[in-house]
Swiss-Prot record:
Enzyme kind, highest EC tier: ligase
Amino acids binding ATP: 7-20, 101, 145, 170
General function of this protein: Catalyzes the formation of N(4)-acetylcytidine (ac(4)C) at the wobble position of elongator tRNA(Met), using acetate and ATP as substrates. First activates an acetate ion to form acetyladenylate (Ac-AMP) and then transfers the acetyl group to tRNA to form ac(4)C34.
GN (gene name): tmcAL
EC number: 6.3.4.-
Alphabetical UniProt keywords: ATP-binding, Cytoplasm, Ligase, Nucleotide-binding, RNA-binding, tRNA processing, tRNA-binding
Designated name of the protein: tRNA(Met) cytidine acetate ligase
Record organism: Pediococcus pentosaceus (strain ATCC 25745 / CCUG 21536 / LMG 10740 / 183-1w)
Subcellular location(s) of the protein: Cytoplasm
Length: 366
């Protein structure tokens, strides 16, 4: 069977996402669509609006055949490393295609990735590795979806087993839009509306609306006490070991945390021209979850949800060594220790029946 992979967050799943899955299947004529999805914390360095299991259930009910998880340490990383993990998983699963939304689908993504790679080397020589890495994550250069597309092309070119990249015209609002003006809206606008209990119903499929209404919605403010405690009991030396905390940023954080009464207030105090909100949020998430800089080492992915076609694909492609259907103690210690830590903290503010196996969709609507 030929599979088309889609790397996503679905935070939350909206009409634009459903269109993407439909087009991915239609354009590639793939036998099944695999979604490679962030877990309970997402790439902007914040908790997902609803838990990963419910988002995976929605994806399966809205066009995906198989949903697997990007481990937390990569899901909350820069666009470059987020893409690295997604492409790596897609290749390990034997996907033939990688489809993604783009504002400029005619862009030569492979050529752009080579240009960006050269610019990275130049910036790294002049400044440092951390500052240069922002180039692969810079939405001031172009839209975030195209930045991701370029990073997909970059990592795809590094592999012996390349995927066929399928950029698809994006049918959704700009990710920076904060208002909902119709049936197509940005995920950030929908999150804001859901948290403020204002109207967003026409912008999401029924399955997603049901999930949002029934779930405990989360935001960074739910984790403020945990983060505050972590910072107040940490030394600058300890924070320097945390991924993304460099160039004295640990001192700035510790100087401002006891002057802040909320997560939002701390973010406003920490923001500078050099430190964007997203970069700060990622650093704070790494602090909360005690994520330290380590070499890239992604060997397995966790199965979150599947239908019958997805189960057949896993069996026929002999993916048992790559896809964890049951997570063992050894897996948690070696492959999923950080993800388990993230899930345990998330559960404290958004209770869910953890420990269960993946969601299996039968031939009936769930």
């Amino acid at each position: 069977m030929q599979a088309c992979a889609v790397i996503a967050e679905f935070n939350p799943f909206h009409n634009g996402h459903q269109y993407l899955l439909e087009q991915a299947r239609k354009v590639t004529k793939a036998d099944l669509v695999i979604v490679i999805m962030s877990g309970n914390f997402v790439q902007r360095g914040e908790p997902a609006l609803i838990n990963k299991w419910e988002r995976a259930r929605v994806a399966i009910n809205c066009g995906a055949d198989l949903v697997v998880e990007i481990p937390t340490e990569y899901a909350i990383d820069s666009a470059k490393e987020f893409a690295h993990a997604g492409v790596e998983i897609a290749q390990k699963l034997g996907a033939s295609f990688l489809a993604f939304g783009s504002e400029n689908p005619d862009l030569d993504f492979e050529n752009e990735s080579k240009i960006l790679d050269r610019q990275f080397d130049q910036r790294a020589k002049k400044y440092n590795q951390n500052f240069a890495a922002q180039l692969f994550d810079d939405t001031a250069i172009m839209n975030s979806n195209d930045i991701l597309g370029i990073n997909y092309a970059y990592w795809n070119s590094k592999s012996k087993r390349g995927l066929q990249l399928i950029p698809l015209q994006r049918e959704q609002a700009d990710h920076r839009d904060t208002e909902i003006k119709g049936s197509i809206a940005s995920a950030s606008a929908i999150r804001r509306a859901a948290l403020e209990q204002s109207e967003y119903f026409n912008a999401v499929p029924k399955a997603s609306l049901k999930a949002i209404r029934n779930a405990k919605l989360t935001s960074w403010e739910d984790f403020w006490i945990m983060l505050n405690y972590r910072l107040l009991t940490s030394t600058p030396q300890e924070l320097r070991h945390i991924k993304g905390v460099t160039e004295g940023f640990e001192n700035r954080i510790l100087n401002l945390v006891d002057k802040s009464n909320s997560f939002t207030e701390l973010m406003q105090k920490l923001k500078t021209k050099r430190y964007t909100y997203t970069r700060i949020q990622r650093s704070l998430t790494n602090i909360l979850l005690n994520i330290q800089a380590t070499p890239f080492n992604l060997t397995k992915t966790r199965l979150l949800a599947t239908n019958q076609l997805g189960r057949i694909f896993i069996r026929e492609a002999a993916l048992g060594s790559v896809v964890m259907t049951k997570v063992t103690k050894e897996d948690f210690e070696n492959n999923y220790a950080i993800t388990k830590r993230a899930d345990d903290l998330y559960q404290l503010v958004s209770p869910y029946q953890w420990g269960k196996g993946p969601i299996i969709k039968k031939n009936v609507k769930e």
